Amino acid sequence: PILYNRTKEKRYLDFAKYIVGQWETPGGPQLISKAIADVPVANRFPHPKTWFSRENGQKAYEMMSCYEGLLELYKVTGNPLYLSVVEKTVGHIVREEINVAGSGSAFECWYGGKERQTQPTYHTMETCVTFTWMQLCNRLLQMTGNSLYADYMETAIYNALMASLKADASQIAKYSPLEGWRHEGEEQCGMHINCCNANGPRAFAMIPQFAYQVQDDCVRVNFYAPSEAELVLPGKKPVRLKQTTDYPRTDQIEIEVDPAKETAFTIALRIPAWSKIAVVSVNGQPQD
């Protein structure tokens, strides 16, 4: 529905609905009904005879991209089924596929990787999968405000994504396995790059957009790292935030809040799900 949002031409919205409707036909992928039936993501399609083919439905990047499109359609139609299906699928991915480094896949496919992460596998944690997983979680975070999605992104950023980057930042690996060595991947389309060379930078560029988000009169601080941000609240009210921290090496985070003029708004600080004790202070005074 992105073209519909830009043009307001109904034919684009109708086409988006048609695509989703075709999912549930006998020959379609049934991405909605399989999610409702709690089919594991690695089992939502039969294993193809040829890996690199249109029949390969386990491809993680492509499957998540379909669910991203469903979220965009939800934003236009408000159909609660669409959001529910995506949240259920993300739950399956977390329980079945995401490893200790915050990403997943082998040969770019879902494969029940969470319980197999201590076993030798090949071409694991494709950077395109890491990027798309972060993007899907970020969209759900923006829509629901559920900080668990930010937790998933943080784990992926500090582990799988950082592991894909060469020490001098000159190259992004296509695969970053939990053992062995990084694999930079093959050249594609007659160019000196591949898909992960393109999507890796998109993942890094997503971090500042994810770190601070504004919704209504609320500023959400989702990611803790030394940074400065200039944000605009509704009514064109600018506010500047400066974050000083050595997190995650240490557990102290200091945030300076500097609105252009006195105004009332909320600051929502992410408390990671793994944190057993969290203390928030304002001007040195602990808050309840």
Name these PLM-found stretches.
Residues 1-288:
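Glycan-recognition and catalytic cores of secretory/periplasmic carbohydrate-active enzymes
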